[in-house]
Amino acid sequence: SSWDGTMYQYPVDGDRHYLKYRKDVIDNPEMQKKYKADTGKELKVPTTWKEYGEMAKYFNGWDWDGDGEKEYGSAEVMKKDDLMFAAFYSRSAAYSKNPRTPGGFFFDLETMTPLINNPGFVEALTDWVDAVNYVPPGGINFGLGDEINSFGGGQTLFSFSWDDAFVAAMQDDSPIKNQVGAAQLPGADKVWNRENGMWDAKANQAPFFVWGWAVGVAKKSKEKEMAFDYLCFFANEANHQADIGIGRFG
């Protein structure tokens, strides 16, 4: 992380959100045939939030994996003050972050006017309000731990957040080990253009880095170069790859 050409922090963890889904459903020819017959649409990894919602609704509230229990559409962090904001921003980015209008996502960089009320964010909120129709019972009060356990325990078709739910799903005690897939966050078929005040009717995906960690070196350190050299090692690709798969955390 730098400002005006001077490095102040070294990124060591990029906490991006991504989509988790049940491969045994999405890639299942019989399920694809049934979904096509019932909806007229293809069952595939969703590339837009509208598709995500349609599929999640279809697979909500019935036993689609044959375990004797009802499954649901999506596990999401919806609980107030429990990282709910992160889930909302991930849903908002595709509608609001237009590559034709570079600059701020949360604020206009020239005026610092908040952008949270623009139609892109409103469209995402409209989708999210509808999501209460395809989450598990009590899902509107799910915190991060609930989302992890719900998807990781085989309760839902989809979830999206950090690595935790995927890692949980791949544990030896998970009923869905090796039955989950990962993909980029869904996008949108339109994106708000704040410069002309209109929707751009174009496909848009905007992967969102939610959170992240960085390390700095103390100003009074006598070995700044050595410290930064260690950080380069600590944050190398091999260490990141190893870190992703360790434990029930992202």
Predicted regions and their residues:
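Short helices/loops that flank or line small-molecule/ion binding pockets
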Residues: I26, E51-F59, G145-S159
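Acidic, glycine-anchored loop motifs typical of Ca2+
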Residues: T39-K41, D63-K70
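Glycine-centered hinge/linker elements that transmit conformational signals in sensory
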Residues: W49-F59, A87, A94-N141, Q184-K190
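Paired acidic/hydrophobic, glycine-rich loop segments that form the ligand-binding mouth/hinge
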Residues: L157-W162, G181
